[in-house]
């Protein structure tokens, strides 16, 4: 998805890694997603070279994993499959949290995808080849780590098919968003609705959709 440059600051920092190779760290500040569904959390960061306690503000874990689920569906990267498989293996969210997780996925799917899809499809996951695990995932894991694609993929797909069984209100949110109408009250209420009702990315995408539809009708 192409975000106007005035809404984003992007910096690339080059460095030499422990192996003596040139690498880079890219940091992007996207002002269009500065509103969050859930309150931010304070998390401790453990750095081997720092003796003092360090804590940073972080997006709520549920929103992070909702975004990862959307990324997995959209780009089918091995690292996203690995992350969602770990979500299931370690039981990060219990049954009572699945409803909110689904709503977060629906929300971020609409604002974060190039095209709004009326339903979630997982066919691309079935086509992920084992060699992509070797080339794209294993190099960033601990030495000697192994990831068995077939059972992990099956487990993740089964989970997502159950999780993303949308109710009528959630489906209507997607339908309306695809027409350029942002109606967060179909997903949320109370404080959460207040948090997102003026979400800049959602409003920008809906404005853009309505403008494109209007131009096509002319």
Description of each model-found segment:
Residues 1-218:
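Structured mid-to-C-terminal alpha-helical surface segments
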